[in-house]
């Protein structure tokens, strides 16, 4: 029978790699709590119109990359989420979450895009994101950027730089759009097929082209920031001033437009040169009109999302050490007849918060194995202590506690006194 394997571009996350994921997620949860962000979890499958309306019909994601299908039960058009912001906004609108003021939310989870798998880019990938909804001020933009910047410090990430731009408001973009189209129409011979297709539908995205033959053209294109009015400029200046006051370095990138149509005013990316062409590890911006587009009352919002795989890849590139989780203790059990007593003792320890791994045979009828082989496995497990439940110890109602990592002498302890040892162990963590 043919062996079934994972879909190309959709990867299993196995130990010990999964420990790196847990470490990152724990760091994020701790940091989000400091900034008063609360967790939200939305469905992986959403109505297709949510993304068409929210992201824009002529975006690459909607045109080329979504996993969409028809529900066989009712004919509804459904899509595996390619990003999470639209789903978070849908949930906020559906459940009237802004009735009593703004909300700070964060999420973690898998996203799906049908694209060619390569380093840092997968068909199932994972994002962590933060959304501040109901806050119109530039301080909200700055705070959410500071949140991401603080995360890099928590993770020990280096060589990550911040790029900023402002997309202004819709009327300012319309004026820039007209000037941009007029400029590009004078250079039709330089435009590639994709740029010609976008010229009158989404010309701003042409500025984000990776085509080397078009780089000189886009460098000379009208800059959106030169079309901003006083209010938009002041908003952007306030964001930059707050970042400066916090010692956060940034650079202006007038070609930064992001891949979704819902952005306005501040947009930003955190980028690195250590991941080749997939150098953006986090991006976001303000999206004041998305809530209204999805059917809610107008409410401002700003957010970002980071690519988990890319962040972990960057940590690996920088050789950041992530502590491998290990049990506090490893139970060495020479005789299977002792298992009822041993497992009762281990359950009491676990109830007190002690993590214990018990040696178990890997094949039927194999037996418990020699003491020597069990001690080898105990040492390889990374546990701090071995708990030896030998026949002599059990006859005395005791267990031998042998340090494997910590200093100190091995000692015999009564089974009834293991609770005291557990309390001492926890206080020494």
Curated annotation (Swiss-Prot):
Enzyme Commission designation: 6.1.1.21
Domain of life: Bacteria
Entry keyword set: Aminoacyl-tRNA synthetase, ATP-binding, Cytoplasm, Ligase, Nucleotide-binding, Protein biosynthesis
Subcellular location: Cytoplasm
SUPFAM superfamilies: Class II aaRS ABD-related, Class II aaRS and biotin synthetases
One example GO MF annotation: ATP binding
Keyword Aminoacyl-tRNA synthetase in annotation: yes
GO biological processes: histidyl-tRNA aminoacylation
Gene Ontology terms: cellular component: cytoplasm
Catalytic activity: tRNA(His) + L-histidine + ATP = L-histidyl-tRNA(His) + AMP + diphosphate + H(+)
InterPro entries: aa-tRNA-synth_II, aa-tRNA-synth_II/BPL/LPL, Anticodon-bd, Anticodon-bd_dom_sf, His-tRNA-ligase, HisRS-like_core, HisRS/HisZ
Transmembrane domains' residue ranges: none
Keyword Transcription annotated: no
Pfam families: HGTP_anticodon (PF03129), tRNA-synt_His (PF13393)
PANTHER family, sorted: HISTIDINE--TRNA LIGASE, MITOCHONDRIAL-RELATED, HISTIDYL-TRNA SYNTHETASE
HAMAP family (UniProt xref): His_tRNA_synth
Family of this protein: Belongs to the class-II aminoacyl-tRNA synthetase family.
Subunit structure and binding partners: Homodimer.
Name under which the protein is recorded: Histidine--tRNA ligase
Organism: Acidovorax ebreus (strain TPSY) (Diaphorobacter sp. (strain TPSY))
Primary gene name: hisS
